[in-house]
Amino acid sequence: MTGAQSRGRIETVNGVQLYFQVNGTGEPLVLLHGFSGSSQDWMASTTEWGNKFQLIVPDLRCHGRSGILSKPFRHEEAATDMLALLDHLGVGACKGLGVSGGGNVLLHMATKQPERVKAMVLVSATPYFPAQARTIMTHYADSLPQQQWEVLRHRHPEGDAQIRALLASTKAFATSYDDMNFTPPYLSTIQARTLIVQGDRDPLYPVEISVAMARAIRQSSLWIIPKGGHGPVIGDGWPEFLKTAAAFLREA
């Protein structure tokens, strides 16, 4: 599939309604937002990268315009959706950029069908949920400030019912041990050239997890951001990060 342009559409993929956009020309690149985010998070990036890649930008299941599901979100199921979306679009292999939960989805894609992910950039992703993340996840929905609710309402058009369904998934994450459970031997099956980006002050995932993941993934590089938290490139550092990520992805 080359040279496709799309304003966005909703289609049934893998048995669920998925919203996605396809824009630009070049090698297929899947952009995956984080948990509770949406495809809107990539709006500025799609304008800048449209002449470098064919951008495939979905709302993951349960997110944005992909509607509400009656069961908790699982990264593994979202990865199956994304592989099915590639099939639906006639895309054999792709590159990927995922932030937080989007990076977790890419890990599943790159281990389920290693030959289909040629290169990927993982920002604040994790092979498993450590204890400190589980503690935060348990209480996250109970302490969400009103300002964050307004951000979520902007991202999720189904309103508070959709947001509450998403937030219920954070408690499910806290007790799940089979969704994110990548051992080093399993990570070693990844064929993609991989850039791992991690803040050294991430409250969810200690930097040591990323160091171990980089050792396990054979063709990986690790970019540790000093004093960086979760999603350390978001904010003032985003334009420079996009340049670095684009250069890495175009080389692979």
Model-derived features: where do they sit?
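Flexible "cap/lid" loop of the alpha/beta hydrolase fold
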Residues: 104-112, 118-150
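Conserved HGGG/HGGXW glycine-rich cap/lid loop of the alpha/beta-hydrolase fold
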Residues: 16-67
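Acidic catalytic loop of the alpha/beta-hydrolase fold
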Residues: 201-205, 231
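Short beta-strand/loop motif that positions the catalytic acidic residue
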Residues: 190, 196-198
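Short alpha-helix in the alpha/beta-hydrolase fold that links the catalytic acid
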Residues: 192, 206-215
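Active-site nucleophile elbow and catalytic-triad environment of alpha/beta-hydrolase enzymes
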Residues: 169-186
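Catalytic active-site module of serine/aspartate enzymes centered on a nucleophile-bearing elbow/loop
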Residues: 220-221, 226-252
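Active-site loop/oxyanion-hole signature of alpha/beta-hydrolase fold enzymes
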Residues: 23, 47, 56-97
